[in-house]
Amino acid sequence: MFKDITPLLLDAAALAATVDQLAEHAAPLDVDVVVAAEARGFVLGGALAARIGAGFIPARKPGKLPADTSSVEYALEYGVDALEVHRDALGGGARVLVHDDLLATGGTAAAVCELVERAGAEVAACSFVMELGFLDGRSRLEGHAVHSLIAYGS
C-alpha cells in the first residue's frame, strides 16, 4: 500500500496544520534537535525543528554529506541500505526527536535511532505523519515513544 504525502504538501493550510500538530506533540519533549531521514522526512522535519526551536540534522544516503560521517546499514524488503549523519552533529546527552513522513516496517526509523544512540544522544521520541499499522513498524522501535498523526490498519 503506497501512501503519498504530496497532496498534503500542495495545500498550504493542510501543511501548516500538519506542522502545528506535529509541533504540539513534540514541543513538550524539550528536544535539542530533530533528526530526519532522507528524503521525505526532510520536508516536514526541518519545519518541525524550526517551529519547536530545535536544530535539524539530516540523515542522508551514503556519500551525500561532505564531512566525516557515522553510518548504519539496515535491511529493506528488497536489500540493504544505509544512512549517515555528520560525526560531529550529535553531542553526547542531546535529546533527539526522530522524524519521518511514514512508519511502515520501521527499518529506516530504527536505523536513525541507532545512529543517534551510537553518538551518545538520547532518542526522546519518534514522530511520523502516517503509520501503516498492519506492517507493525512500532515493534522495531520498542523502547521508544512513537507518535503518528494518521494510522492505517492495525
Locations of regions flagged by a protein language model:
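PRPP-associated nucleotide enzymes
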Residues: 1-154
